[in-house]
Amino acid sequence: EQVAQGKSSYLFKDFAHAPSKVAATAKAVSQQFRGLSCIGCLELHTYSSLDPAFLPNYKNSLNDLDEAIVFYDPEALKIKGRPVIATEDIKAAFGLAGLHVFTDPASLHRYLIDKNYDQSVLLMMSSGNYGGLNWELLSSKFA
């Protein structure tokens, strides 16, 4: 779903969270928007995606992107009765050098809002809410 579009930038929201869907969506966007920087932000919030034993299924799923971000809210782990997942474990599971991992909603929001999206596509992948992300404010970056 296209959320916003600027002169040379696009913001998309996709409900992808299964590893194969994440990989297919990232690949499709990077192929469709050649010449633009493709940035993907995946929120891990489903029961399976927050399972350390399941995380390796995401290996290479974000490799087609120019920049990849993974976010999970430790509150979601607490609610599901799961232990905190170390940032290093997430990076190792995805197998992507330079992967940005956020576990604090405010830090993620600040990072996304402060970013310059000229000549970029931002693909937000989750059926969650990124810890209460202000979509209106983020969309304004693409006007």
Would you name each region that the model predicts?
Residues E1-A143:
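ATP-dependent carboxylate-amine ligase
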